[in-house]
Amino acid sequence: MRRHPSHSPYRGGCEVRPKRRGLMLAHSSSESPPESLPDAWTVLKTRTAVRNYAKEPVDDALIEQLLEAMLAAPTASNRQAWSFMVVRRPAAVRRLRAFSPGVLGTPAFFVVACVDRSLTDNLSPKLSQKIYDTSKLCVAMAVENLLLAAHAAGLGGCPVGSFRSDIVTSMLGIPEHIEPMLVVPIGRPATALVPSQRRAKNEVVNYESWGNRAAAPTA
């Protein structure tokens, strides 16, 4: 059941949700994570964008597990002003790819990540705009959860903002109050993963005051 701010979803400034069981990756949610899964730190450090996919289907049960991991993402005030569409049929995947120039390969399936405007536009204009802006960030965090879960399960993907939103909305029968934000192709990588180069930590991290790039002293 969706919780709204009036239901006090925060305790001491932290979001409270029902407890979830297991990692929910490629296994039943009532089971413990398989030992073969990589640890969380490795997943975080090795995930990279995957744009070329092997011609292999992804099991429906695994897709459902990935979606559960996606929905465990943080959401402001637990409003969950998001909605997602899964596209799995090969013909539909090809059509969606045709109107998504940012997608280079043909994935096993797509997730279209959207903001649910019916949960952002029912307040004062100023507050509705603020909640809408925040909800877009929540959708992005859900997509990151999806990508990390996919990587942990031996799959890969890439968030794509370059797509014909009007055509995709019409093609998938998406209602007017649902606004697509990202198209996310997911599949098994066709080639070995090559991590992208990142800026050095001392270029982007400041400690205690702006411009102080010295690492925090160890205890």
From Swiss-Prot:
Homomer. It is found in: Cytoplasm. One of its GO terms (molecular function) is oxidoreductase activity, acting on the CH-CH group of donors, oxygen as acceptor. This is Albonoursin synthase. Its EC number is 1.3.3.13. It holds the Pfam family Nitroreductase. GO terms for cellular component: cytoplasm. InterPro entries: Nitroreductase, Nitroreductase-like. It comes from Streptomyces noursei (Streptomyces albulus). The gene is albA. Optimum pH is 8. Its cofactor is FMN. Its main location: cytoplasm.
